């Protein structure tokens, strides 16, 4: 247990930052899940919209050092590949 006033304050600050970081990380994760749901449903417009939001939120998490940049890059890359594959699949069906 902290004895110094500054240490007690830091415990409070850390709890607040942890909650904020958890919310931001959860928001990014939820957008990734929404993208996957749109992919499963085959809704291209929703996929593009959620991809942009997921990418933006992942980059924000990287800038605030909530997640590692390579983790965000990997998730964004995989979503982009799935979006492109879906696009190619739709074009093949149209032909």
Curated annotation (Swiss-Prot):
Similarity comment text for this entry? Belongs to the bacterial ribosomal protein bS20 family.
Q: What does this protein do?
A: Binds directly to 16S ribosomal RNA.
Q: Name a single GO biological process.
A: translation
The domain of life for this entry's organism is Bacteria
Q: Name one GO molecular function term.
A: structural constituent of ribosome
Record-linked Pfam families: Ribosomal_S20p (PF01649)
What is the name attached to this protein's record? Answer: Small ribosomal subunit protein bS20
Q: Does the keyword Ribonucleoprotein apply?
A: yes
KW Ribosomal protein (keyword) present: yes
Assigned keywords, A-Z: Ribonucleoprotein, Ribosomal protein, RNA-binding, rRNA-binding
Q: Which GO terms describe its cellular component?
A: small ribosomal subunit
């Amino acid at each position: 247990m902290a004895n110094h006033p500054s240490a007690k304050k830091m415990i409070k600050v850390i709890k607040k930052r942890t909650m904020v970081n958890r919310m931001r990380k959860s928001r990014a994760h939820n957008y990734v899940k929404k993208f996957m749901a749109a992919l499963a449903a085959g809704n291209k417009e929703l996929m593009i919209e959620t991809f942009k939001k997921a990418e933006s939120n992942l980059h924000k998490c990287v800038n605030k050092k909530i997640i590692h940049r390579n983790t965000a890059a990997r998730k964004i890359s995989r979503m982009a590949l799935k979006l492109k594959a879906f696009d190619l699949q739709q074009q093949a069906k149209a032909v």
